[in-house]
């Protein structure tokens, strides 16, 4: 009985916090499907990540807040391809794919949707279902990040960018090292819209150290110079959190 009572209190506290969250309230007012839109918006505003006319791949897109922001940011220009293992309500101007990014056939469908276009930016909000076992959760998260990096190496323009979500803790240093091996510039990020108590953090990599043939062969014209990378606030991340 005590366990159930405590569980109800925890759930009520979370619900109260969620309802009163200024980003949740703002998302409702501005028509975003989730508060996560403001994480991407903050990163974009600080670092100049997204530009009209870009081709962007949104991994782990459901419920669609990042894709919504991308579509609004790019207006009617460019292309957005959204993928998630969970179904997502359609969004005008967004190609939505349903499937597990870890499956080869799903990656093939994603490549078919690109129709030969090279990608300016890949954003990934993918995260595994957490088991509470730190080493297992870290391994699952690492698998998703590594797949996103591998996809980016094949499809990004030489000066393209990859933004991924990950959790600060076990395995973080290895993934940061992978980014430094892959990209010319790497910035760790903790947007203000990310909850203070959460171990959620982001890594942004820009400029492939070894450009893929796809990017070199398919670029149209001269790519714009990438905006300088400036950390949001501080680069220090909380080691623990929800």
Swiss-Prot record:
GO molecular function: rRNA (uridine-2'-O-)-methyltransferase activity
Region spans: Disordered: 198-242
Keyword hit for Transferase: yes
Keywords: Cytoplasm, Methyltransferase, rRNA processing, S-adenosyl-L-methionine, Transferase
CDD domains, A to Z: AdoMet_MTases (cd02440)
Enzyme Commission no: 2.1.1.166
Subcellular compartments: Cytoplasm
SUPFAM superfamilies for the chain: S-adenosyl-L-methionine-dependent methyltransferases
GO cellular component: cytoplasm
Residue numbers annotated as active site: 165
Ranges annotated as biased composition (Polar residues): 233-242
Reactions that this protein is recorded to catalyse: uridine(2552) in 23S rRNA + S-adenosyl-L-methionine = 2'-O-methyluridine(2552) in 23S rRNA + S-adenosyl-L-homocysteine + H(+)
Keyword Repressor: no
Source organism superkingdom: Bacteria
Protein residues bound to S-adenosyl-L-methionine: 64, 66, 84, 100, 125
Signal peptide range in chain numbering: none
Annotated InterPro entries: RNA_methyltr_RlmE, RNA_MeTrfase_FtsJ_dom, rRNA-MeTfrase_E, SAM-dependent_MTases_sf
One Pfam family recorded for the sequence: FtsJ
Similarity annotation: Belongs to the class I-like SAM-binding methyltransferase superfamily. RNA methyltransferase RlmE family.
Role: Specifically methylates the uridine in position 2552 of 23S rRNA at the 2'-O position of the ribose in the fully assembled 50S ribosomal subunit.
Record's protein name: Ribosomal RNA large subunit methyltransferase E
Species annotation: Verminephrobacter eiseniae (strain EF01-2)
